[in-house]
Amino acid sequence: MKPKDVLTKLEAVIGVTGGPRRLRSAIELVLQDSFNLLPLQALEKAELLEESVRDLIAEEEETAPCPKLTLVSSAEHMVAGYCYPNPSDSSEIAAAKRSRLNIDPLLQEIRNLTFQEFELFGARVLRELGAKRTKVTPHSDDQGIDFYGILSLGQNSFLPPPFGRLAHDVRLRFAGQAKHYPTTPIGPEMIRELVGAISLARHNVFTTDDEIFDDLELLPFNPLVAMFFTTGRFTSGALDLAAKSGVIAKSGEELAVFLADKSVGMYDDKGTVKFDKTRFRDWLSSQ
């Protein structure tokens, strides 16, 4: 068996809320229960696999949109569920962990949207990023761009005073595509289409004379962030092309994590954070 296969079984056994335990002992149990090794065989194999599995957990904590496990003690190689409530957590981290327990129902509700609603969802996410002016383009004539928005940096109080004064008149543009493909991965050709559409928009080249992008006010040297949202996932080729071309590509799971961390659609029920479809829909339709 490969370390990745063992990690997958560990994630299922421990779960996102599982308490701390020794990694090697957890691997031993998985090897016996899921791979039918005898106790002595499992003990020897766990010793060989421990470092590799630990490295995979650390890597997923850094790169995965929604890691399942976390390393809680490097000295003894202890592991726990990623959302396990640690007494040392700050109030912000504790709240984020409670919200992340609702990622699955939140993702399912995102996938339940119609393709028109998912384009509106793209514009709504821009508002969560701070954009004040957002718009969804007409579906029949979107010129390869489904949604866009403008963020005025001078309106954001998080900027330090010197930079805030310098950036007062800077307006950051966002433009993107939203593809409702829950089961079909996004390939590099779709990333290429978005890059081409934005390149044409920069030069004011469109297939019609409609002025649907006038609100974007895109000039040759305006800063613009290209975004691609999907309810599903991306192929490795699409992610590679997005990284090389500067496109921010977000899968359905990554979008669900982003919204869960902002408590979208969440409410507190006697200390338990729960997801509510109506609250999510209210958020989607709010201006």
What is each model feature region?
Residues 1-287:
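Mixed-charge (Asp/Glu-Lys/Arg
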